[in-house]
């Protein structure tokens, strides 16, 4: 196994929290993600552990959305808030991010909050790194417009 579970738990939790916007639900999904990962028949031989964890977590988040049909408002700020605070108030950023599609918001959160490598995000979204870079630039451009800022991240 290329990475330890402890190293990735916080990243997967933040990802789940950003997706479902409810602390307890994110904790449950994160735990279920790691249980399913460990139950995977060949988890010791998986080269792309992070990608598998995010895929499992994403599927569980989608299942949760299907159950509830609506996402709850966040109870408190996600753990990756240092970036938000250094650029602008968390409230302004949350408003701007809310204007993005779910997939665009997920891409930005994975890249800039969870610091997931581009190649992993590209594989999760079935696109090339080139297409992902172009899409991120497009998303950041829209965020700049929404915020009226010259620099964002």
Label the model's feature ranges.
Residues 55-75:
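Arg/Lys-rich amphipathic alpha helix in sigma70-family domain 2
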